[in-house]
Curated annotation (Swiss-Prot):
Biased composition annotated in UniProt, kind: Polar residues: 1149-1160, 1229-1242
Protein's name in the database: ATPase family AAA domain-containing protein 2
Subcellular location(s) of the protein: Nucleus
InterPro entries per the UniProt record, alphabetical: AAA+_ATPase (IPR003593), AAA_lid_3 (IPR041569), ATAD2-like (IPR045199), ATPase_AAA_core (IPR003959), ATPase_AAA_CS (IPR003960), Bromodomain (IPR001487), Bromodomain-like_sf (IPR036427), P-loop_NTPase (IPR027417)
Bias-annotated ranges (Basic and acidic residues): 223-232, 1135-1148, 1185-1200
Acidic residues compositional bias, start-end: 244-288
Task performed by this protein: May be a transcriptional coactivator of the nuclear receptor ESR1 required to induce the expression of a subset of estradiol target genes, such as CCND1, MYC and E2F1. May play a role in the recruitment or occupancy of CREBBP at some ESR1 target gene promoters. May be required for histone hyperacetylation. Involved in the estrogen-induced cell proliferation and cell cycle progression of breast cancer cells.
Subunit comment: Interacts with ESR1 and NCOA3 and these interactions are enhanced by estradiol. Interacts with acetylated lysine residues on histone H1.4, H2A, H2B and H3 (in vitro).
Cross-link for Glycyl lysine isopeptide (Lys-Gly) (interchain with G-Cter in SUMO2), residue positions: 125, 317, 1128, 1148, 1236
Tissue expression profile of the protein: Highly expressed in estrogen receptor positive breast tumors and in osteosarcoma tumors.
GO BP annotations listed: nucleosome assembly; nucleosome disassembly; positive regulation of DNA-templated transcription; transcription initiation-coupled chromatin remodeling
Length: 1390
């Protein structure tokens, strides 16, 4: 500190009033440390009375002394003009450091310091290494001044005593003001520079973290302390000395600012009170040291960087939200190992995260980087918290999920890929061609590399899957990944979703792509599968964001750039082929493109077989074929969903009780049978994925109109095969196809025709002559033997209005040709989209049909279509049709309600009658109409009402609650491996507990608890404390594997504390000290465990303990043998030596340790326990004497056995040779007592059984009723028959039903009264006049002779409504009358 001084004249008491104005400003001018000012004020208060007495006694002596000191001061001023500065600064620093240890200043301490200040200045001259040359000059000036003054010391004062006294007053006063400003500015610069230096050192040492401070040796710790103290002496930021080696370092880093501020505030208050006392002591100080200006400062000594110690692996449990220090300038320090602190010290840790350190010397770029890292960590923590499950708390997550949450498991490069290993190629149906092509790309290069080496070719390295959703694109990728994981040559499989590689950071997406391909190249052969690749590589355009363009460019370069990607197969999947950048769709990148279309009939059947192959019993092939035929437009995912929904329908139908309870009930799985009705319900609920957005025009004939129009559909298909031979190729494909080897279907590739050789050495002379005569090797023209051919295929279905050509026939034909791609060009398609013109829509549809040939263009109601559209669209349509190549397999299918001759000429030119392109629909004949109405009138009208008794019986069935599932029995190898893992966990627990106990034992405060209490010193300790415990006994129990959880350990720590509090009263100071230390021991142990123990580890130990208890595994199995050594027997005779093998076995087993603090227990007489204690109190009953005697004998036997058990257990505890823990002994004793209590209870059950004889008889009806309900096939007549025959037991049945009433009503399915009413109703007989129904059928067929399809459907609906109204009638007479009346009154005018 720089201290400004007044003139060197002596204090003149008479001039005190004249210096009032300057005295008031002394606080501002004085920059001296407050501790020094307090010391001088204390000295002034002590010497003031003496000075006053001397002054009053002899005034001349005062003048002489004043003259003497003025002379000496002037001489010193002229001699040391070059060294005038603050000579008292170093002395103030030394005194401040010496007084900092005390923290509390008193008058007595101030006097003692004032008396010894000369010796302290001469002996304790500390010159910091970081002081400048100016500080050394100060010390030299101080020594020279002491030599000149002799034993008269120049006292310093921070005040200007007199305004007019002194030598050359104007010069001194001017220099005073100048030096004041310079000194203040200089001191401010020094303090800022010191703070910056210290911040840099803390940043360099910031890597020291928590446990490293405790691991430093004495030399390193002292060296760091000297370096830090050097900076502290030159600044005013440290006042306290280090009390201990560990606590001092934490104080220097954490408590500097707070202690300094508090102490400065206190000293400022004391300074105002001691102003008057300082006047008498500070009057002798001179002011010649303020005459010299401040010159250039010296640079500080360079502090070289010291490499930090390597961070130890063991550290305290990681925090979820803060993985490291919040700021590099404020590192975190943990509790020291020797003296653990209170958990209240965490307050500074919490505040530290809110403090942002700033370093003015660091560059702006480093600050920005640190600020960015902090913001990124905070944003990641918030994102992680948002991703947590809503019904899970942070402490409920398992350790592995916590670890993934800490490292940011949502990143693409660290997220593991989980695959279903059960999906193989045999789990994929209807895609055999795609699977064979994938084998060529991946499997064959590994199995047959010599083939590719011979021709120096590379197999295709990329393929693109495209098609509608749910057609098996991702499924094939999963199957490929699992197939590549089998065998010796495994293929690495990388899977990335569409947006996994996208990131908001510039360049991060490209970096992840490069890392992905680099990793795949290092692990080659490998496969990279991009699911939904349209989100990663969309079409590049000028209006698109530049980021996506950069990603697409990077992907293009990685797939086929200057550097070959080697054995890396890239597979992409999308359902939007037009959204992918066209540069990807070329050989070298995506060599092959596989269309995953909707499965046909055979593919659907194969998919159904795959999903039902594990059912028991398996469904019939005929049923699966019929089901596949009705699942038109269903993709593979839809079929899988139908199978699952059918199984749920069967479960709902068989056991409706499970939907009303949350408990698991016992079910008979063999009684759950899936029927065709379940599939019907599932198909009614299920809407195919392809029909949710756009409805497909193809639709099979419904079961109602199928007898009426099936023949017509067959005729249309025959006519279509003549015009469009590809239809026969598709429909009859299943007749001669080989599904196991689909590649053999190509007749051209596998034909037996002799073809000329293309090799040089394979040509014969004839062939060479032919080659010279321009012989053609390639026949690229169409061959009629290998491919069907058609010329502009077109067909028009013509009929009268109402014949069903547009509503039934054309959709049925399209359904039969379901393998072809169908494009609808009707009026809603043309005018439904407002963004495009009809002409543009028409052109796009026809171009797509041409591109995907063979295909179908469907134009329904072409007579209306041609009248509505304009001439531009007509010209566009006809032009595009003419531009299609002549032999292109693009079929034009149209329907019309007008005859061909009534159509416009342009339409008539499109469809030529002579080519068979026109099909006229005829009315149904008599046979077709008879089949149409036969099922409705003869079968459905005569069907009896549906009986609900079977459903009621199933609803009344009360299912018992299922017991919890038993765990799978482990094999011997699995048990051994499990025990090894558990022992590894317990080994870590024991190491941790030993460390905690060692830290408690080496603490001097807890030394009294390290050893057991000596019974010789305190004989009454045994009588007061029943269970002594100390830290040495705790260590012994740790060695013997007695602690399976930390709770057991803390229980013994609590026992040590409770024993100390119980034995030591709160009266004597020594006893109170022990009580305080016992409480401190307990709190310290809890604090250490709370700070360093992971809660997941404690939960794991508890689970292992519970598992071992259930398995009956002893914890002492792995305890060390021979832990207790027998004492040496020097005088033992040979005959006294034991040779019993049983004794040797006892010595090998680990015995229970006897705690050192546990004294030898005195043998007492075991008091007989009462019956209440044993839990065998008998109920007083009036029974026979024989039973009473036998019961008494059993009671005596139980009591005697219990006493023997207690005696043996006491002997065990006294000898200390038991091989199991005390917990296990208690469990064994409890089990023994429980077994005897069971014997007693069994003897009492005979009376209870006698009392329940009557109730057993009354349950016979209930058992019979339950058996009927469980069968489910028993008819209601059987139940009524039982109740009629057993009239005497009718009350029994009703009474048992009332007993089950609460259970049935809890299911909330049906009320008991309603169920009993349904079951008690008799089943009336069915009355049907079949002759009248046959006559009605003939009448209907005759009347509907000239009806078209719509009129026949209308009549069918009228008859169906009559049947529905009378569905509950058993007498069908009224139904027949109503149907006859409706048929007679039916009119076809509509």
């Amino acid at each position: 500190m720089v201290v400004l001084r007044s003139s060197l004249e002596l204090h003149n008491h008479s001039a005190a009033s004249a210096t009032g104005s300057l005295d008031l400003s002394s606080d501002f001018l004085s920059l001296e440390h407050i501790g020094r000012r307090r010391l001088r004020s204390a000295g002034a208060a002590q010497k003031k009375p003496a000075a006053t007495t001397a002054k009053a006694g002899d005034g001349s002596s005062v003048k002489e002394v004043e003259t003497y000191h003025r002379t000496r001061a002037l001489r010193s001023l002229r001699k040391d003009a070059q060294n005038s500065s603050d000579s008292s600064f170093e002395k103030n620093v030394e005194i401040t450091e010496q007084l900092a240890n005390g923290r509390h200043f008193t008058r007595q301490l101030a006097r003692q310091q004032a008396d010894k200040k000369k010796e302290e200045h001469r002996e304790d001259k500390v010159i910091p290494v970081t002081r400048s040359l100016r500080a050394r000059n100060i010390v030299q000036s101080t020594e020279h001044l002491h030599e000149d003054n002799g034993d008269v010391e120049v006292r310093r004062s921070c005040r200007i005593r007199s305004r007019y006294s002194g030598v050359n007053q104007s010069m001194l006063f001017d220099k005073l003001i100048t030096n004041t400003a310079e000194a203040v500015l200089q001191k401010m610069d020094d303090m800022k520079k010191m703070r910056r230096q210290r911040m840099r050192e803390l940043e360099d040492l910031g890597v020291f973290n928590e446990t490293e401070e405790s691991n430093l040796n004495m030399y390193t710790r002292g060296k760091q302390k000297d370096i830090q103290r050097t900076d502290e002496e030159t600044t005013d930021n440290q006042e306290g000395s280090v009390e201990s080696s560990e606590e001092g370092e934490d104080q220097e880093h954490e408590d500097d600012g707070e202690d300094e501020d508090d102490e400065d505030d206190d000293d400022d208050d004391d300074d105002d009170d001691d102003d008057d006392d300082e006047d008498d002591e500070d009057e002798e100080d001179g002011e010649e040291e303020n005459q010299k200006r401040y010159y250039l400062r010296q640079r500080k000594a360079t502090v070289y960087y010291q490499a930090p110690l390597e961070k130890p692996r063991h550290q305290r449990k990681p925090n979820i939200f803060y993985s490291g220090p919040a700021s590099p300038a404020r590192p975190r320090y943990r509790l020291s190992s020797a003296g653990p602190r209170s958990p209240y010290c965490k307050r500074m840790n919490r505040r530290r995260h809110a403090i942002h350190s700033s370093d003015s010397t660091s560059s702006s770029s480093s600050e920005d980087e640190q600020h960015f890292e902090r913001r990124r960590k905070r944003s990641r923590n918030r994102a992680i918290n948002r991703c947590l499950p809503l019904n899970f708390r942070k402490d409920e997550l398992k350790g592995i999920y916590k670890d993934r949450m800490k490292i940011g498991a949502s990143l693409a490069d660290v997220d593991p890929m989980q695959l279903d290993s059960s999906v193989r190629f045999d789990s994929v149906g209807g895609l055999s061609n795609h699977i064979a092509a994938l084998k060529e790309m991946v499997v064959f290069p590994l199995l047959y590399p010599e083939v590719f080496e011979k021709f120096k070719i590379q197999p295709p390295r990329g393929c693109l899957f495209y098609g509608p959703p749910g057609t098996g694109k991702t499924l094939v990728a999963r199957a490929l990944a699992n197939e590549c994981s089998q065998g010796d040559k495994r293929v690495a499989f990388f899977m990335r979703k569409g947006a996994d590689c996208l990131s908001k950071w510039v360049g991060e997406s490209e970096r992840q792509l490069r890392l992905l391909f680099d990793q795949a190249y290092q692990m080659r052969p490998s496969i990279i599968f991009f699911d939904e690749i349209d989100g990663l590589a969309p079409v590049r355009s000028s209006r698109q964001d530049q980021i996506h363009s950069s990603i697409v460019s990077t992907l293009l370069a990685l797939m086929d750039g200057l550097d070959s990607r080697g054995e890396i197969v890239v597979i992409g999947a999308t359902n939007r082929l037009d959204s992918i950048d066209p540069a990807l769709r070329r050989p070298g990148r995506f060599d092959r493109e596989f269309l995953f279309s909707l499965p046909d009939k055979e593919a659907r059947k194969e998919i159904l077989k795959i999903h039902t192959r594990d059912w028991n019993p398996k469904p019939l092939d005929t049923f699966l074929e019929e089901l596949a035929e009705n699942c038109v437009g269903y993709c593979g995912a839809d079929i899988k969903s139908i199978c699952a929904e059918a199984a749920l329908c069967a479960l709902r139908r068989r056991y409706p009780q499970i939907y009303t309870t949350s408990e698991k009930l016992q079910l008979d799985l063999s009684s759950i049978n899936i029927s065709a009705k379940d599939f019907e319900v599932a198909m009614q609920k299920m809407i195919p994925a392809s029909q949710r957005a756009v409805t497909s025009p193809g639709q099979a004939l419904s079961t109602v109109v199928k007898p009426l129009l099936q023949n017509t559909v067959d005729k249309i298909l025959e006519a279509l095969q003549r015009v469009f031979p590809h239809a026969e190729f598709r429909t009859n494909k299943t007749l001669d196809s080989d599904i196991s080897c689909p590649l053999l279907e190509s007749d051209l590739a596998y034909s037996d025709d002799d073809v000329p050789s293309v090799y040089e050495n394979g040509l014969s002379q004839k062939s060479s002559h032919k080659a010279k005569d321009n012989f053609n090797f390639l026949h690229l023209n169409r061959n009629a033997c290998y491919q069907p051919m058609s010329f502009r295929p077109r067909i028009l279905i013509v009929g009268e209005p109402g014949f069903g050509q547009g509503s039934h026939l054309a959709p049925a034909v399209i359904h039969a040709l379901e393998k072809f791609t169908v494009y609808t060009l009707d009026i809603p398609v043309l005018f439904g989209v407002s963004t495009t013109s009809p002409e543009e829509t028409c052109a796009q549809v026809i171009r797509e049909a041409k591109r995907t040939a063979p295909s179908i263009v469907y134009v329904p109601h072409i007579h209306v279509w041609w009248e509505i559209v304009g001439p531009t669209l007509k010209a566009t349509f006809t032009t595009l049709l003419q531009n299609i190549p002549s032999f292109a397999p693009v079929l034009l299918l149209a329907t019309s309600d007008k005859p061909h001759s009534a159509l416009p000429e342009e339409v008539q030119e499109l469809f030529i009658r002579d080519y068979g392109e026109i099909f006229n629909v005829q009315l149904p004949d008599k046979e077709e109409r008879t089949k149409f109405f036969e099922d409705l009138i003869l079968k459905q009208a005569a069907k009896p009402p549906i009986s609900k008794k079977k459903a009621v019986l199933q609803a009344l069935e009360v299912l018992p609650v299922a017991p919890p599932p038993e765990p799978r029995s482990l094999t011997a190898e699995e048990v051994k491996r499990l025990e090894e893992q558990e022992e590894d966990t317990f080994r870590e627990l024991r190491i941790f507990l030993r460390n905690v106990t060692h830290r408690l034992a080496i603490d001097k405060r807890f030394r009294v608890f390290t050893k057991p209490v000596d019974p010789d010193e305190v004989p009454d300790y045994v009588t007061v404390i029943k269970q002594p415990m100390d830290l040495s006994s705790v260590i012994s129990k740790i060695d013997l594997h007695k602690y399976l959880t930390v709770k057991d350990y803390l229980r013994d720590i609590d026992l040590i504390c409770s024993n100390a509090l119980e034995y030591n009263p709160d009266r004597d100071p020594g006893d109170r000290l022990i009580r305080h230390r016992a409480c401190a021991l307990r709190d310290t142990a809890y604090a250490i465990i709370k700070e360093e123990l992971d809660e997941d580890f404690e939960q794991l130990c508890e689970e292992i303990q519970e598992s071992r208890k259930k398995r009956g595994c002893s914890s002492s199995k792995y305890a060390p043998s021979y832990y207790h050594v027998m004492p040496k027997q020097n005088s033992t005779l040979v005959g006294d030596k034991r040779s019993d093998p049983e004794q040797n076995e006892k010595l090998k087993t680990p015995s229970t340790p006897v705690a050192c603090s546990t004294p030898a227990q005195l043998k007492r007489k075991i008091r007989k326990k009462s019956n209440w204690y044993l839990g065998t109190i008998k109920k007083r009953r009036k029974i026979s004497q024989a039973k009473d005697d036998s019961q008494n004998a059993i009671d005596h036997k139980i009591e005697s056995d219990t006493e023997e058990t207690q005696d043996t257990s006491v002997d065990h505890n006294e000898t200390g040779n038991t091989g199991e823990s005390s917990v296990e002994e208690n469990e064994k004793q409890q089990n023994a007592s429980e077994s005897k209590l069971e014997l007693r209870n069994n003897s009492n059950t005979c009376n209870i059984e006698n009392e329940l004889e009557d109730s057993r008889k009354t349950t016979a009806c209930t058992e019979l009723r339950d058996k009927i309900a469980c069968n489910g096939d028993a008819s209601s007549s059987q139940i009524i028959h039982i109740s009629d025959e057993n009239e005497g037991k009718e009350m029994c049945v009703l009474r048992m039903t009332r007993a089950r009433r609460s259970q049935v009503e809890q299911q909330q399915l049906i009320t008991v009264e309603k169920a009993l009413a349904i079951l008690s109703q008799p089943t009336p007989s069915l009355v049907v006049d079949h002759e009248r129904l046959k006559n009605l059928l003939k009448t209907v067929v005759k009347k509907s002779q000239n009806y078209n399809i719509f009129q026949l459907e209308n009549l069918y609906a009228v008859i169906s409504q009559c049947i529905y109204r009378h569905r509950k009638d058993h007498d069908k007479t009224s139904l027949i009358q109503k149907m006859e009346q409706e048929v007679e009154n039916f009119s076809c005018s509509r």
